[in-house]
């Protein structure tokens, strides 16, 4: 009977796998202060702004036609619109910090095929954001409905579309983090990645808003943020929004398209 050579055993032990790459990326995320602060900021923004906006709506309750179209779920989830910035910045930092310090050369030397590194970062940032944003979304929904209940404006998880909107808010933040990761991988600059993120989510919708009314509505509903946030509403306005899952699908398509472009650059470009 022949025994494996020590060299073969060593090569097997040191073989790069996607699971090992993901463990490495998870360690980087846990030990990077900027990333952890971004994750914490996302949770705080979801909860704090959701509660604050619920209090404001109780102080100024809707009347007439506004009361008929009032969406208590989206009120509680209003913080998602701010938290998307923190989630996106988390994605940017997860890769641009390595370019800033030069660690990316060591990372790519350890993972010569390169792409498993990007997929590992994508999996880790998605998992981390979902893990904290689902409890945050559920908590702020319950808190917001308790506040809105003072004016009999509340709803419950049992109502159609409510659970989807709450979980959709958490999923939206996860995709926002992927969007940030893709932009960071493409631009390889923290400032550039964050600026591009702000431009895509905030500046472009403002510019589109200057177009003639119907054209602005038609184009606006397909923009990343507007499309994705449709999943956080129970009854989206068909004039200005896509249906919930269609809108979320469009948002995912933006993230995947940019992630694909980032993969091409990572595979072909220099570190």
Predicted regions and their residues:
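Membrane-helix interface segments
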Residues: 34, 113-115, 189-193
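Short hydrophobic, aromatic-rich alpha-helical segments embedded in or entering the lipid bilayer
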Residues: 21, 215-236
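Transmembrane helix boundary and interhelical loop/hinge segments in multi-pass membrane proteins
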Residues: 88-110, 114-115, 122
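Transmembrane helix segments
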Residues: 190-225
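Membrane-interfacial segments
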Residues: 56-61, 99, 103, 143, ...
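Secretory targeting signals
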Residues: 2-15, 35, 39-91, 118-185, ...
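Alpha-helical transmembrane segments and their helix-start/interface "positive-inside/aromatic belt" motifs
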Residues: 23-41, 125, 194-195
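Actinobacteria-biased recognition of intrinsically disordered, low-complexity terminal regions
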Residues: 1-27, 256, 260-271
């Amino acid at each position: 009977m022949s025994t494996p050579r020590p060299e073969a055993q060593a090569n097997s032990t040191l073989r790069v796998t996607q699971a090992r790459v993901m463990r490495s990326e998870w360690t980087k995320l846990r030990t990077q202060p900027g990333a952890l602060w971004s994750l914490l900021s996302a949770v705080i923004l979801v909860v704090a702004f959701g509660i604050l906006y619920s209090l404001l709506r109780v102080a100024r309750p809707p009347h007439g036609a506004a009361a008929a179209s009032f969406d208590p779920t989206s009120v509680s989830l209003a913080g998602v619109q701010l938290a998307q910035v923190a989630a996106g910045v988390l994605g940017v930092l997860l890769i641009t910090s390595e370019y800033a310090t030069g660690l990316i050369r060591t990372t790519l030397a350890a993972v010569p095929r390169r792409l498993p590194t990007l997929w590992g970062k994508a999996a880790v940032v998605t998992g981390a954001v979902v893990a904290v944003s689902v409890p945050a979304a559920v908590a702020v929904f319950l808190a917001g409905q308790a506040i809105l209940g003072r004016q009999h404006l509340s709803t419950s998880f049992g109502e159609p579309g409510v659970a989807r909107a709450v979980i959709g808010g958490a999923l939206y933040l996860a995709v926002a983090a992927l969007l940030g990761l893709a932009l960071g991988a493409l631009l390889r600059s923290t400032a550039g990645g964050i600026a591009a993120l702000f431009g895509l989510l905030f500046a472009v919708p403002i510019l589109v808003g200057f177009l003639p009314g119907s054209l602005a509505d038609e184009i606006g509903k397909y923009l990343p943020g507007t499309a994705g946030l449709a999943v956080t509403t129970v009854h989206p306005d068909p004039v200005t929004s896509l249906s919930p899952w269609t809108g979320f699908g469009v948002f995912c398509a933006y993230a995947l398209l940019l992630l694909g472009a980032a993969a091409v650059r990572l595979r072909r470009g220099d570190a």
